[in-house]
């Protein structure tokens, strides 16, 4: 019976719900762990000056990576909802069809089209 209720949920909605909850939980975990001042730092000012920039970099990297992944997932879900596809495979096929201009296409006589070419094709 629970499976029947889940069958009516669109894939896009499920992905959006999971990405939103993942973003909220990861933000909470970051706030509770690495964004806090860790207890293992010594009161030594030399060690503090050596480790402090690394800690700031780690905080920025962690926050921006979580934010980037959640924003990408959220944007993908919005795009999928806008174009009317329900799963990732359809979205990939749609993108492949629409972005066909970006595929490499063979150019006829590309070597011999230059006036001063030194390659002879026999």
UniProtKB/Swiss-Prot annotation:
It is found in: Cytoplasm; Membrane. The chain crosses the membrane at residues 9-29, 60-80. Keywords: Cytoplasm, Membrane, Transmembrane, Transmembrane helix. One of its GO terms (cellular component) is membrane. The keyword Transcription regulation does not apply. It is a multi-pass membrane protein. The keyword Oxidoreductase does not apply. This is Uncharacterized membrane protein C21C3.06. It comes from Schizosaccharomyces pombe (strain 972 / ATCC 24843) (Fission yeast).
């Amino acid at each position: 019976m629970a499976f029947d209720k889940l069958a009516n949920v669109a894939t896009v909605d499920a992905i959006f719900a999971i990405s939103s909850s993942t973003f909220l939980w990861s933000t909470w975990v970051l706030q509770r762990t690495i964004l806090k001042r860790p207890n293992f730092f010594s009161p030594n000012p030399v060690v503090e000056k050596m480790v402090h920039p690394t800690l700031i970099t780690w905080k920025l990297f962690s926050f921006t990576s979580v934010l980037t992944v959640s924003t990408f997932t959220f944007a993908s879900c919005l795009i999928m909802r806008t174009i009317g596809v329900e799963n990732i495979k359809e979205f990939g096929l749609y993108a492949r069809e629409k972005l066909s201009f970006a595929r490499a296409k063979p150019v006829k006589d590309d070597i011999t089209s230059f006036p001063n070419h030194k390659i002879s094709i026999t």
